[in-house]
């Protein structure tokens, strides 16, 4: 089983339908689709990207399960034509965290389970160009997974 694909799917499902101020926030996997229509909230285009992932064997391997650690990056972005505010990305990131912690720790038919979810990085980035300012809330989650053989 590809644990990276499974975890990415679970995160996508947990975030799907997320709204802020009555506006649904689009979610992209890997990168922003340049042809996508982005919603505007408080003058900024807003979206979420599920980015980098990695998986590696856990140091502890009990007899009845196979343990893996999987990291995944969620980036909440708001892009403004001029200067904007970090409020939107910070509020949306809080809702992202609530959804992740509330829905990901579910066992999938005794095949893959999530023991712990840790928010290992919570970072605010500001990027500027001559014409735009972008605010990103970067959330990196570390998932302790266990796989059983059925």
Task: For the regions a language model picked out, list residue spans one by one.
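Small/polar-rich, solvent-exposed N-terminal microdomains that initiate assembly or binding
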Residues: 1-64, 103, 107-111
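Acidic-leaning, charged glycine-interspersed low-complexity segments
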Residues: 44-46, 97-148
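Oligomerization/assembly interface segments of phage tail-like spikes and tubes
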Residues: 66-82, 134-146
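Extracellular/virion structural assembly segments
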Residues: 63-69, 77-103
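Intrinsic-disorder/low-complexity loop/linker signature
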Residues: 22, 61, 83-86, 109, ...
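Short capping loops/turns at secondary-structure boundaries
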Residues: 4, 85, 89, 130-134
